[in-house]
Amino acid sequence: MDHARRCKLFAVLTLLTGALIVQGVPPVQARSVRTSIQPLRIFGVGSVLLGTGSILVRTKEGVGMTLHTFGLVPGNVYTAWWIFFNNPKACTGGCGGDDFDNPDVQAVALWGSGQIAGADGTADFGAFRAVGDLTGLEPGNGTVGLVKPFKAEIHIVVRSHGPAIPALLSQQLSKFDGGCPPNTCMNLQAAMHQP
């Protein structure tokens, strides 16, 4: 599917999600689900990547996300990571990587999804993470899972793992530094969803 069609599909899904939440859900249920839509930004720079986007759905049981991005190297491996700042009020000057050192923030990075970029340089990710689920937690990436979905600041980070290496592909698709070395892993894009 080409980039223009994916962008249109993402826009339609966004509108349908909003319509379902606004029209088809009784008021009691509407308060128990919250949806936010954010563009992706260049990691470390902050510039918006037009035509990209992420949808985050919060419930008391956990969070779900879909993400569409482009400008990737065709055939390279990418992962999407959940970054939960469970107590964003304890962050210093906005939540970010430095806040992992502050135990009051209760920050954690957890794997979300992995993809190989298409021939057109696009990738679509989707994932769900339940409250308290620490599946795939790696050393140094935090100690707690998602605690309170409606109060956490949630970032979704797209990470590059370089060209696909057949013998390491499983790790490249699911580990923070999978395939690195010999490749170089780096965070490329991020979407920030405020509580």
Model-derived features: where do they sit?
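Bacterial N-terminal signal peptides that target proteins for export
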Residues: 2-12
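Bacterial N-terminal signal peptides
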Residues: 11-23
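Short, Lys/Arg-enriched N-terminal segments with co-localized hydrophobic residues
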Residues: 1-3, 26-29
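N-terminal leader/targeting pre-sequences
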Residues: 28-195
